[in-house]
Amino acid sequence: GIYFIVAKPTNEGETGIARYNDIQIRNCSLDTVNRWGIAVGYTYQWRQFTTGALSDATMAKYASSNVVIENNYLNHVGGDAITTMYLDRPLVQYNVSENAAEQINTKDYSQQQPSLDANGNENGKQWVNAGRVAAAIWPWKCKNAIFQYNECFRTLHASDGNGDGQPWDADYGDGTNYQYNYSHGNTASTIMFCGPESINNTFRYNISQYEDMGPLDPAGNSGNCQVYNNTFYIKEGLNTIWHRSHGNGGPVDMENNIFYFAGNTPVAVNDWNPSGNKTYSNNLYYNVSTYPNDANPVKVNAGTQVLVNAGSGPDSVADDKSARRHEDPTATTVFDGYKLAENSPAINAGKVVVDRNGYTIDHDFFGHKITAVPEIGAAESDAVAALVLRSNVYTVTGTNVSDLPKNTTVEDFLNNVIVDTGVTVTIKEGETELKGTDIVKGGATITLSYEGMESVTYTVVASSDKELKGCFYEVKGTEVRVP
């Protein structure tokens, strides 16, 4: 495969700490390779990365940076397909993996592995299963790694010696984000959150289909872990959303997900909350007879049309071996069976999610902008059920809008508010309609209208530009007294 390591310089005092900057691995095809397909960044400075939280100072000094891995195809990889190691904010996108972990099994790993000293000399033996783990596309000791628009099929041998077998694995690292990915037919769970130094994870707007185990594998992760707006199509015969044997002890917060259990017989789901540290809010549960403690569940019987054609996602790679694009909301894609059906109970049934890891929530799996009232699952829709205005910039309380900076124009305002597609927004000062570069001042009204619905009006509360106005004031110690 392709393997980049950072070796110790002969004279580090003279040359400085070694690290890569600006590695781009693009448009490569790797077929039938040994332990790794693509791996970038293993460093002699690994001892600087021994905590869960990775500071920006540590990353700037010791981590490699500006790494992009995209548009690669990997097949029949002996172990892991793509791994980023000790990298600051790597971007891994539009890659396709199939048949990873081909050698991670009890036949190929049937003897004890050698243990090596710092000079590479054998100094003993490890257990037979040492190193017998491989997932497809994942980070190790990276900060704010983004994995998006990747596809993964049939990561192998989770039931035959491979301790992993997932398509995605938020392993030891800080701020890992998996978004807009598609996986099918992998032998373990969809996503593993692995170990106590796996923190601040985001898993959102992904589609999973027919994995051999339940979709989630919180294998001892700690701290913040958000799973929201995913669609999990769980194959018939499974009665859990968890990995079969990893214990599932890590915390996970689940919001706006579709848990779609295939088949016609309601599934008695086993243990929605192992270790008692899982939370649920606004998820949709299809074809189940037992439910978790969800703050606002949507319970759906088998036969209800939730998705256009559930289970119809691709089961193999594209003919040209490339990742299939799906970020244009006007385009037809092979994933369209996972768009929401007309009158789906998932439409306008979601909650407004705040990503605690600081990732902006812009669009869904298909590139559709997130609307004022979000949907449940990986797909948004154009359906309008209520006239609602919200913003990630201004404060909306009831029908009042506040915290507009001074001299906010109509154009600025419209760029910073969110309404459903097709809703008309009219801004007025008194009876005069404001447009373009007109300034939106306190007292202005914002009216939302949509055909067949009663309009809703919001009012702008006087701008809080947070500037200290001209006045006499008294300074005493650390206090400023304003009359």
Ranges and model annotations:
Residues 177-183, 195-337:
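Predominantly extracellular beta-rich ligand-binding scaffolds that present long acidic/polar faces
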Residues 15, 19-20, 25, 33-35, ...:
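Parallel beta-helix/beta-solenoid
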Residues 454-462:
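Edge beta-strands of extracellular beta-sandwich domains
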Residues 298-383, 400-406, 482:
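C-terminal accessory segments
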Residues 385-422, 467-483:
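Solvent-exposed, low-complexity, repeat-rich "mucin-like" stalks and linkers
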Residues 1-2, 12-13, 34-40, 78-86, ...:
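Short glycine/acidic-rich loop motifs that flank beta-strands on beta-rich extracellular proteins
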Residues 420-453:
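Serine/threonine-rich, repeat-prone extracellular segments and beta-strand-based repeat modules
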